[in-house]
Amino acid sequence: MLSEASDFNSSGSRSEGSVFSRTEHSVIAAYLIVAGITSILSNVVVLGIFIKYKELRTPTNAVIINLAFTDIGVSSIGYPMSAASDLHGSWKFGHAGCQIYAGLNIFFGMVSIGLLTVVAMDRYLTISCPDVGRRMTTNTYLSMILGAWINGLFWALMPIIGWASYAPDPTGATCTINWRNNDTSFVSYTMMVIVVNFIVPLTVMFYCYYHVSRSLRLYAASDCTAHLHRDWADQADVTKMSVIMILMFLLAWSPYSIVCLWACFGNPKKIPPSMAIIAPLFAKSSTFYNPCIYVAAHKKFRKAMLAMFKCQPHLAVPEPSTLPMDMPQSSLAPVRI
């Protein structure tokens, strides 16, 4: 019980207002510091690659650039505030800091799921509906990306203005949705978030990648030129990277979703403290593994990273074919003013 938590001088004692000991808080703080530094550096490298090599600045990769910004946002704000509170033994930034911290984490998380949905739609239109995909303009992509940011902002602001609320969790070192107060406001907010930012995006992603996988299988069973084979291989690389990112994102946010659903339909007091800290740690983890996915699953991005480290001014990118499926994204239909 939080009211029974006491503050002793020994390093293994419980911190005031927390269910964790000083030692446990210190271990978590060390993890957050290392993860935060790793995340910031790796995502800065990602942005540097896109800045240096214009060959990679396609509308699809514009979504990846925005994902990198969301990762940097969590890493530069969420990690330091949480780590400082863990070192302190309890939340140290007051009520206003709690609202800012929790709001920004929800904001960047919701934006990320929106951007991953945009990636899935892009893969579907590029591979399975090329006639439609070719007609998409830069403004179309910008509108979808902006929609993801606006959606994230809406759900982040709602607890601040009264629909549900933000509060420190039982560990006392992080702020999140106040799931210990499972009133009607919390339940309605949580269920709407799950429907709008989990069930609907997953349905869209499943539909898109189901049809993309069918298109890729049909290609594999057909005869084609070496030139077209290279184009399809590039598209398959991007699709593989996208699917891995989505699966890892779901893995990262699943503990948080479980905690919220448990609080909605069960007794919040029975949620284990370990689950309370694992949920936000898992949710933040996507910030540093996304760059690893880019490198591991996308050959062109991997070559670009190596080229940047070797200080090569240009990236050798083969000319794509002019067949409908793989029209280069740089030749999208002109933006209509």
From Swiss-Prot:
Glycans are attached at N9, N182. The keyword Transmembrane helix applies. Keywords: Chromophore, Disulfide bond, G-protein coupled receptor, Glycoprotein, Membrane, Photoreceptor protein, Receptor, Retinal protein, Sensory transduction, Transducer, Transmembrane, Transmembrane helix. GO terms for biological process: phototransduction; visual perception. CDD domains: 7tmA_Peropsin (cd15073). InterPro entries: GPCR_opsins (IPR050125), GPCR_Rhodpsn (IPR000276), GPCR_Rhodpsn_7TM (IPR017452), Peropsin (IPR002962), Retinal_BS (IPR027430). The modification N6-(retinylidene)lysine is found at K284. Pfam families: 7tm_1. PROSITE patterns: G_PROTEIN_RECEP_F1_1, G_PROTEIN_RECEP_F1_2, OPSIN. Found only in the eye, where it is localized to the retinal pigment epithelium (RPE). In the RPE, it is localized to the microvilli that surround the photoreceptor outer segments. GO terms for molecular function: G protein-coupled receptor activity; photoreceptor activity. May play a role in rpe physiology either by detecting light directly or by monitoring the concentration of retinoids or other photoreceptor-derived compounds. This is Visual pigment-like receptor peropsin.
